Amino acid sequence: MKNIKKFPFILTILSLLTIIVPANAEIKVVASIKPIHSLVSYLMDGVGKPDLIVDGYASPHGFALKPSHAKMLQNADLIFWVGEDLENFLEKPLNSIAKKA
């Protein structure tokens, strides 16, 4: 429920990014799981396409990051994730790899 309360804040950030980032620069957005990726894709329609970390039929509970995922996080301007309760595999990488996001 607390994540739903964050939704207006997320929309505001996305809106500000479209104003701040130059028109020809692509915003690099990463979503952790498919439901979040679907929502972010809808919001970014016409602006860009977010990358997805946990794809296919993988479970976020026992997921292990690959080097390609670490690169996604490192290059991201904005990262959407549920939190450490569901995606504990992202907690440390977000603190160390994705400092600019």
List PLM regions with ranges.
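Bacterial N-terminal signal peptides
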Residues: 8-19
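Extracytoplasmic metal-acquisition and chelation regions
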Residues: 2, 8, 24-101
